[in-house]
Amino acid sequence: MLCRSNDELELLISQARAFAGQGEVAQYIPALAAAHKHELSVALYYPDGKGFMAGDTEENFTLQSISKVLSLALALIDQGEECVFTRVGKEPTGDPFNSIAKLETNKPSKPLNPMINAGALAVTHMIKGNTAGERFERLLDFIRCLTGNETITYNKEIAKSEFETAHLNRALVYFMKEHGVIDEDVEELMDLYTKQCAIEMNCIDLARVGCVLAMDGCDPDTGKQLLPIDVARICKTFMVTCGMYNASGEFAINVGIPAKSGVSGGIMGAVPKKCGIGICGPSLDEKGNSIAGIKLLEMMAKRYSLSMF
């Protein structure tokens, strides 16, 4: 039996929030450093179109690495599975999400998977469009379709902040350009990617996207197929194997659902055939995941038997 009460969620939120003090908000992106570490919110979205929520669920936050799932979905639709995976691998890595190490040591020199920064940059490179601006608008329209929210946009301040400080990501792009993975202007790709990471939504929007994935690409409100079934399957698989950075294995054991986190404190979950989950808690653990958000999901997994394993 899944949660059917906002009060139930409020109780779980109050218990999980106590762990927020053990983490810190992201400091390396100046515009994210101003977040309040004890904030925590959650929303559930069900296949019948109903939703339940607790905390500041209408407060917007930036997707950051959660956007990697959505850019992957669009790139797969645009280019097909074979093309995408000639440039990006399918294997997890125990390295930090922004590491360059495996790019240098693996042959051929392509990113191990789409959920690390190098892989996400290569994936964003594959989104179709004549200009970086056109490609971003296509991605934005795609995300608006998945959320059912036409007002979704991006945070210009955070995009600018990330663009100005993305020195390591630029190094990744230059390295991949040298090895033929990427063949576009570095600054154009960085502009597109930082805007992608700065796309904003609230927990309800995020839970709805999670529900679309949970229902194999089907819109929970209209029944329309928004994503090809195989695209939804591939995205969920990467969420299980790589979605929680280099804590993905531990998360699979303790929670057991496809999920993707971001350094703004967001987590998107997709409980297959049951519901989508959207969480935001800016206080992060040492792996870059929302510390209270993970505790909340662990509590929910036990209480509602969410694990798919």
Swiss-Prot record:
It comes from the Bacteria. The keyword Hydrolase applies. It catalyses: L-glutamine + H2O = L-glutamate + NH4(+). Keywords: Hydrolase. Substrate binds at residues 65, 117, 162, 169, 193, 245, 263. Its EC number is 3.5.1.2. InterPro entries: Beta-lactam/transpept-like, Glutaminase. GO terms for molecular function: glutaminase activity. GO terms for biological process: glutamate biosynthetic process; glutamine catabolic process. Homotetramer. Belongs to the glutaminase family. PANTHER family: GLUTAMINASE. This is Glutaminase. It comes from Shouchella clausii (strain KSM-K16) (Alkalihalobacillus clausii).
